[in-house]
Amino acid sequence: NSIFMRLSGYARGALVGRAHNVVRHPDMPAGLYRCVWDDITAGDAVSAYITNRSSDGGRYRVFATIVPSGAGFLSVRTLPMRTDLRDAVEAVYARVRQVETASDAAGASRREAAAAGQAALLEELQALGYRDSVDFTRRTLPDEVAALVAAGVGIPARDGDGPLARVLAEMNGVEVATADLVALLDECSRMVALLGRRSDEIGSLSARLKRLRDCLREAFADVERYGEVDGLILECVEQLHPLAGQVAELRSDVDSVRFGIALLRLHNLASGFFALQIIDGEDELDANDAVGSLRELTRALRDGAERLTERLALYHARGELVGGELDDVAEALTAIDRPLLDLLGSVPDAGADDEAAVSSVRLARSLVRDGFPEARHLADLAGAVRDLEVPYAAADIDARLVLVEAALAELA
């Protein structure tokens, strides 16, 4: 489109039908493109900070998001907003390029050098706190979209008649319908962080309860004396065993919802701005299949809307399940507190014949000195999971996309 031509410095005829290599900058590592290709061919969306080369040998930076679309792929590029992260990633690229250059010098083939670069890039991403390139996309796209919205980027309105005007009006309508969704990006981010902390806390709590059971067995020779308390602790341990994994899965669900919201808004913005460029005469309707491009953007928007519906259904189902489990564990922990303190208080601190037993009791007391604050944490988490409401007007968005598709059919 006109923006791509302006940034790259190429005329339309010099770009149509050409491979992306025409704007590839030598600073970009081959390992990145290998990661991109692996991810999109696996059906995943990909986001990356990319530096392109313009026709005069200069450079321009973009934040690219690529998704599978039909038999091919759809790429949307925006101005990088997280400049701190962009700079950190560009430093990573420079180090990865050094690995690839060293591989070249050692006689590696281009494919082998790219593989070495890909491995180095994935290690670098892990050092930045990302599991892999898919995790980078899942977390970075929402941040970039949230920053765009915070900067006031939105689809301008235009008065007018005709199919393109209707496309723009409906894309404005989708933007309005998803405004509350976009406002949830930060809330979802906080929920993801909270679920991560609680998942770690559950693991630590489980280990503490197991150690507590060991202490009771070492302190009391008579099983009947501690058996009731031990049974309560065992019940908690068994409830906690699957819960850490369930909370981690719920965290992934929230992450997925957050990503789905961001992708929906990205394709909404791209569709609206492309329609606007044609209306304003910046792009020609018949040039480079503009209608086909709008149709593909609309299809991506519809696919994203449908996937978000699926993501939300999964989150709500798992949230209800995990919320109930969290409540159960919180109640079980609260039920342990008094009987456990009574049991430990029945053993004198000194004077007993069995010093080993006294030592075990002291250790047990240290393990429960502050009680089980995790009970409150887990109960609060259950409430937070249930209280996360996602105002998604799926039917309204679908109806607007039907009108967009009808308008595009008139232009075909």
Question: Language-model segments: what does each one mean?
Answer:
Residues N1-V99, V174, L181, C188, ...:
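Sensory/regulatory domains in signal-transduction proteins
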Residues E123-L234, E238:
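Charged heptad-repeat coiled-coil "rod" segments that mediate homo-/hetero-oligomerization
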Residues G70-V153:
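Sensory coupling linkers of modular signal transduction proteins
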Residues G107-A114, Q118, Y130, G160, ...:
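Intrinsic-disorder-associated interaction segments
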